[in-house]
């Protein structure tokens, strides 16, 4: 079955971020976290340091309604440079203001550029850049907000 997943890149703290997300959404990883050190050596691939071997190669976590967020740590030694920006947003359409507030409050701790959920003309809305540089948007549409 086809699916759309959200893929997030981190700079050495993917495991920490995904453990927070796991607790926020009260769910379990789809499979054990795969570490860079689990990757078989490939021709032309640079030797990984012990610290790099512990970084996340791949992690997947189901969140709401079958959506999965996935992630990795980007390694500069392999030619990947992370640039944190606002080009990735995870938009959550939630069923209640209480659920929006609970998730917002957990993700806003240590975050920046946060607008607490509040009533807008279309529903209840908020946004926050969490402490890992991931932007989250919270929506409870008026039709769900009875």
Predicted regions and their residues:
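Core segments of cupin and vicinal oxygen chelate
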Residues: 8-66
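Vicinal oxygen chelate
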Residues: 2, 31-35, 60-63, 69-82, ...
């Amino acid at each position: 079955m086809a699916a759309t997943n959200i893929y997030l890149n981190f700079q050495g703290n993917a495991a920490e971020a995904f453990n927070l997300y796991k607790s926020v959404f009260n769910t379990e990883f789809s499979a054990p976290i795969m570490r860079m050190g689990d990757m078989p050596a490939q021709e032309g691939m640079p030797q990984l340091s012990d610290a790099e071997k512990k970084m996340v190669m791949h992690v997947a976590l189901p969140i709401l309604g079958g959506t999965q967020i996935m992630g990795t740590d980007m390694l500069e030694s392999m030619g990947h440079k992370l640039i944190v920006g606002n080009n990735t947003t995870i938009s959550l359409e939630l069923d209640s203001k209480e659920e929006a507030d609970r998730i917002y409050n957990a993700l806003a701790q240590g975050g920046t550029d946060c607008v607490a959920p509040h009533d807008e003309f279309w529903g209840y809305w908020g946004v926050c850049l969490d402490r890992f540089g991931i932007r989250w948007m919270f929506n409870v549409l008026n039709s769900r907000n009875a």
